[in-house]
Amino acid sequence: MNQTRTSAADRLTILVIAALLCAIGIIVPIISPIKIRLDPMSFTLGSHIAVFIAMFVSPVVALCVELGTTLGFVLAGFPPVIVLRALVQVFFVVVGAIWLQKKPETLNRWVSMSLFVLVTGLLHGVAEALVSTWFYFGGSIDQSKGFFVTIVLLVGVGTLAHHAVDFALSVLIWKPVEKIVRVPVSVRLNWKKK
């Protein structure tokens, strides 16, 4: 009986965490003071933090927060190419969240964490580049800089860099927060001091 209450309480807590992360994911694109737009690329510092933290909690929470974050880009009035780029992040989010759920120790070792960031960042960059390519060849993206600069460098490599920065910020935020989160989560950081 007590276990059922605890389980229900955990579910409620996880629901509240998901809702708060969705709210953060929605509001960041709207109010972030650090937005750099080099169409079709946009760098909104912190726009992936809620999603990464949700990935640390569970795949379901990550998926919900990713969709909520996409809504934030719609509400912020970003153009369709940027909104669709936000939507295709679902691929790296689901893969990354399942990875962390199956291998929760991933972020506790430098090599496995670097591999995680690289693989999810590449998925992220490729998915966004594919969406942008569709708009590029459809004529709705300025082609004056050429495909390589516009799609490969700005979107592909730019997304990978943005992914890595937001991931690092997410881990720095998660480290103290995880100590007060008392529900089952996919990731607990156990960094050893030398």
Protein language model annotation of sequence segments:
Residues M1-K194:
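Loop-helix junctions at membrane interfaces
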